[in-house]
Amino acid sequence: MKSFVISIGCVLITALPIASAIGKDHSPEDQTFVNEASRGGIMEVKLGELAERNGLSSEVKEFGAHMVKDHTRLNKELGAAATSIGLTVPSDLSEDQKTEYTKLSKMSGKSFDKEYTDLMVKDHTKDLATFQKAESTTQDPKLKTAISSAIPVIQEHLSMAKSDESKLGAP
């Protein structure tokens, strides 16, 4: 019995370095990025669905549908990369995002279109900078691949949002 306990102890001690090595390529900054990017992606999907319902212009409705499709895919890709290296992926919005969503959910028509489009330009400008920074700082190849593949999509979304903003007469 004593040798059995010692054997189990040896197995556990041997397993500790292996368990702690999993996810070693990520940093606290990677977790911060995943938190921000995941919540941002969730917000894009929720707001895209809202744009399809509450938007007035066909541009806003189409842009919303595009956001739902693209960000659902990007969320899955980022989530898979993050969890594969031991990072936690949030599944809900931050309190600030919930407040922003509630505000927009009470709007419709032209006022919704303007507010939504302005927010999409602002958010995608910020997202692009965040993803570009993360791409240059992360050391994990899986996370870097997910980030790198998202950047052209975010650039496209920013361009589309600016075009819609211009068409709608927003600043």
Predicted regions and their residues:
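His/Met- and acidic-residue-enriched segments that coordinate or traffic transition-metal cofactors
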Residues: 2-9, 14-171
